[in-house]
């Protein structure tokens, strides 16, 4: 028995914790009778006020072997890390590298979809509504650099002066040109844009000739083969060759790996990302230690996650914890948090080339955490759901406060859909003049008392069922 479930030692290490129950130090255990000369390695962990790991070091002989720092966005998702490793400098001494290796991360909700460093960018497409990876797309940084191009507005501004010099367009004109360029690239120029060009004495073909060519980078595409939990076991090329494979134990520890092509495959158990510098698996809200089969910090949701604050599912063969919160059934088949895994789908390699054509991101990697994910459009095209943003309660200022005011919005005139006949869902863009939306919401047709508590936009199983139901009625939103 360990006090507060904090393991102080095992067969390999000694552990220390702070007053918040966070692992702060892990040191090699020297067996009794063995004479050592302070050569044990010590791992140290440092956290911010939100209990997120922000600094890690590993030392031996009081000398640093590796150091890393981690950066998070306001939602607590890790968006970057810097790693310094011990190497020999110009004088022959061993020390930490002066220049760190920097890695950036891009997200789609709680799923990590993009990893980029100075050499390559790796994108992951997941099974809809789950954390099971389906497709891996790798693009070299050199290829990404070739995709850089000027926008149509920039091209015209740089050479639009009377003497061939630069000129500055008003923001409204830049916006119109950007919209026109996107329509030309999609081969769907609207009648409104055609009329605007005609009024200027221009044609679509003339504007298209002014645009920089679009470069399609070369990519390496692989299909994931996963077990029933969503743990990757192999990467298969578009030619059907297995170019990476691995074996793991029940807790996600790597037992054997065959990697002749030196592919970087860091996905472990659902929702987990392997950090080579520390040996830990980043698991969204916490870090998982596969050697112990538990987390290094306490559960951020407290007792809602179980009596043991450090516990990973005790039956990892049947249960997962893709969010680092709790082991229990979730809304999504293989998502939510602590969901029971479902059988992965049968992959179809013939579809890979067509999907890869859609993977050019319209934003730089350092904006990926806040930009919409490009893969989401695949599933929205199939969805029968209404993606309109509706308003549950809208308000505008009153001249005076009255006892009838809503207690949540004193001094405000408050309206809801029940104040009108017929009662219906009110889009935020169609509110009465002077009112602003105080409580917006999405998916009114699935957030009913008899429906699920939450809805994922890419929950494909529910989407297809609803599509079939509505098609049989002759109705399609």
UniProtKB/Swiss-Prot annotation:
Sequence repeats: 9-37, 38-62, 63-97, 240-264
Keyword set, alphabetical order: Repeat
4 X approximate tandem repeats: region residues: 9-264
Any Pfam family the entry gives: RHS
UniProt similarity note: Belongs to the RHS family.
Protein name (database record): Putative uncharacterized protein YbfO
Organism classification: Bacteria, Pseudomonadati, Pseudomonadota, Gammaproteobacteria, Enterobacterales
């Amino acid at each position: 028995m360990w006090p507060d479930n904090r393991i102080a030692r095992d067969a390999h290490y000694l552990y220390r914790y702070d007053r918040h129950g966070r692992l702060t130090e892990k040191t090699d255990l020297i067996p009794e009778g063995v004479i050592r000369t302070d050569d044990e390695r010590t791992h140290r962990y440092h956290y911010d006020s939100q209990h997120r790991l922000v600094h890690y070091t590993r030392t031996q002989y009081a000398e640093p072997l590796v150091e890393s720092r981690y950066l998070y966005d306001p939602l607590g998702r890790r968006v970057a890390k810097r790693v310094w490793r011990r190497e020999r400098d110009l004088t022959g001494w061993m020390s930490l590298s002066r220049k760190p290796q920097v890695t950036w991360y891009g997200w789609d909700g709680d799923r990590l979809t993009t990893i980029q460093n100075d050499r390559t960018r790796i994108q992951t497409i997941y099974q809809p509504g789950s954390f099971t990876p389906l497709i891996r797309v790798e693009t070299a940084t050199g290829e990404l650099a070739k995709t850089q191009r000027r926008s149509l507005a920039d091209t015209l501004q740089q050479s639009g002066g009377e003497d061939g010099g630069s000129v500055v367009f008003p923001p409204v004109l830049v916006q119109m040109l950007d919209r026109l360029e996107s329509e030309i690239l999609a081969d769907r120029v609207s009648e409104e844009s055609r009329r605007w060009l005609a009024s200027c004495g221009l044609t679509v073909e003339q504007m298209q000739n002014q645009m920089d060519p679009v470069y399609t980078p070369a990519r390496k595409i692989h299909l994931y083969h996963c077990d029933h939990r969503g743990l990757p076991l192999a990467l298969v090329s578009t030619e059907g060759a297995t170019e990476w494979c691995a074996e793991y134990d029940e807790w996600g520890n790597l037992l054997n790996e065959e990697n002749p092509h030196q592919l970087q495959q860091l996905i472990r158990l659902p929702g987990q990302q392997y950090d080579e510098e520390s040996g830990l698996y980043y698991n969204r809200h916490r870090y998982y230690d596969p050697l112990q089969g538990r987390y290094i910090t306490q559960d951020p949701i407290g007792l809602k996650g179980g009596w043991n604050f450090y516990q990973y599912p005790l039956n990892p063969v049947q249960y997962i914890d893709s969010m680092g919160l709790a082991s229990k059934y979730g809304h999504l088949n293989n998502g939510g948090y602590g969901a029971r895994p479902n059988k992965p789908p049968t992959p179809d390699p013939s579809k890979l080339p067509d999907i890869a054509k859609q993977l050019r991101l319209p934003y730089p990697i350092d904006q990926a955490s806040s930009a919409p994910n490009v893969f989401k459009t695949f599933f929205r095209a199939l969805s029968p759901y209404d993606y309109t943003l509706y308003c549950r309660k809208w308000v505008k200022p009153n001249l005076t406060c009255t006892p009838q005011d809503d207690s949540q919005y004193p001094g405000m005139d408050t309206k809801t859909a029940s104040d009108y006949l017929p009662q219906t869902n009110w889009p935020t863009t169609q509110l009465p003049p002077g009112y602003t939306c105080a409580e917006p919401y999405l998916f009114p047709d699935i957030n009913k008392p008899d429906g699920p508590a939450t809805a994922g936009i890419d929950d494909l199983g529910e989407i297809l069922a609803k599509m079939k139901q509505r098609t049989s009625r002759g109705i399609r939103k």
